[in-house]
Amino acid sequence: TDKLLWRVMSDSGQVIREHYDMAIAYLEGGATYYVHDHVNADRKFTFLHVDYGFAGYTRELDKNCYPDFERIFTVSDEVKKSFVKAYPECSKDTYVFHNLIDQKEIRRKAELPGGFEDSYDGKRILTVGRLTAQKAYEISIDAMKILKDHGIKARWYVLGEGELRGKLQSQIDRLGLQKDFLLLGAKSNPYPYYKQCDLYVHATRFEGKSIAIQEA
């Protein structure tokens, strides 16, 4: 699996010989393994952004890693619950640290030029995220087909890129949704789209705590 690959890649990584007061792994997986195995620091913290079990991680893979961290931060109560279930011995060292967003800056950027360039006058549905299996876009495409078949006047827009673009576009073409479900690619400023849409949808198979939902 990709989780095992990250483990193997970290095992072969270069050791950082400098000594640090503190080292922080910003993400589960490779970053956490690397900080644990190859960084020399007095204190080590790590962050967990996904449901530990649903994301495919296992105690068998990580049992010699997480218990060695002084602090483990999760982005939500549910992520903490899932992690502590796998590592009850880490419960006292695990804390919830919610994602931080700059609301003032988001509102400022939402007022900048940009956003939808068509003249569509129906309901606009928006999703923002990478085009990966985790985000379950194929289900969203099927949902758009149902809306269209029921005569609902709506158009679904997706901001983001990823390895599934070709596969998703093929599904869109097969269902005749070329004008109804649009893959717009990644945008440097997505916030005008948030402001202009009628409904934001975040369909995903698993999630820690979605920053996109917080931003919306």
Predicted regions, residues:
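Carbohydrate-associated surface elements
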Residues: 78, 100
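A short helix/loop element that forms part of the nucleotide-sugar donor recognition site in Leloir-type
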Residues: 7-12, 106-124
